Amino acid sequence: MVSEVEYGSGMSIDVSAVRNHFPSLSRTIDGQPFAFFDGPGGSQVPTVVADAMTHSLLHANANCGGAFATSIESDAAIDESRQAAADFTGSKADEIAFSANTTTLQYLLAHAVARTLEPGDEIITTELDHDSNVSQWLQVAADHNLVVRQARLHRTDGTLDLHHLESLLSPKTKIVAFTLASNHMGTVPPAAEIARHAHSVGALAWADGVHYAPHRLLDREAMGLDVLLTSPYKWFGPHLGIASIRHDLAASWPANRVRPADETPAGHRFETGTQSHEAMAGMTAAVDYLAGLGTGSTRRERLTSAYEAIRAHEDALALQFWEGVSGMDHLHFYGITDPEQFDDRVATFSFTVEGAHPTEVAQRLAQRGMAVWDGNFYALSASLALGLEEGGGAIRVGFLHYTTPEEVDRLIGALGELG
């Protein structure tokens, strides 16, 4: 039975009640419950998100700026979505930009900032990153005669080699692009420290918060970030891209726009064409769903409270999983494996199985009603650095706040039978 989970902070999450918000979690395959360990590739969605999107389409489906009721209601919903995104990212509403997805925003913003740089200027990326925070820099570098350097990860534990990153910094460094959490193996690098290093040479701190956001609360201002991007479909919302851009940058970078388009708010300058109003409404509902798991007088306070409980629940699942699999000699794990260092990782694990191709393992687990991913997960640099690419990559499992201890036990048992 799925029970209430208690936390040291006094907060608790009734996991059964949480799961009731997600119709997909009641799915069965061949008579057995279906376990979603595929969260690193996209989360499930609560009913309130689908309801908000449906309401937007059926009752407030109009473009912006009109004098009539549906347009006025649509404008209000868009304003609220900017505030919700700001509350979620720890920034201000006028710093928010929306697009179809985060990769699209990465390319759009990279091309914008590249127009402010000089030939020979340098950009630093890391081997921990999803390729959407690497490839766009390689492409704008080729277009603008820039230089891209890449900070290494430690092969032993999947952490970022900060000494190597520091050695790459110079007066020519203009952007340090890094992830807040590895979508491959869950590593959480020290964001505020990296941002300070970037700022010490006058560079921007540009962070991919996509994988971090379902596990820990984003805070662009507290982390010292200049640009932060995230994707609601990783944290129980719809497919959408969000960027939080420091106001002076959002207001000044060149933006590709049609002539009649508004220049305010600042983040809106990067929103080409009509956005998905229904996805924005769904995103607001996802933020409010998460905030509803916590307590406080403001949305941000409720989010902070909720994420304390979410982190505690996921940390317990991660430790349960590791205690169950660490003695299995046929499994080889990548990333942090010392429980004393689990504060520096989220509940995402990648591994290989001796003598089995990752796709075969994923298929065998799928037959047992478990969703897992295999491959490189678009974290190509990490897959290459770890020597995994030629062998088909790795298997990846992830736990979210709706994952139960019973599901983790099922996974442990299934992995044990692969040996």
Regions found by a protein language model. Name each.
Residues 2-419:
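Pyridoxal 5′-phosphate
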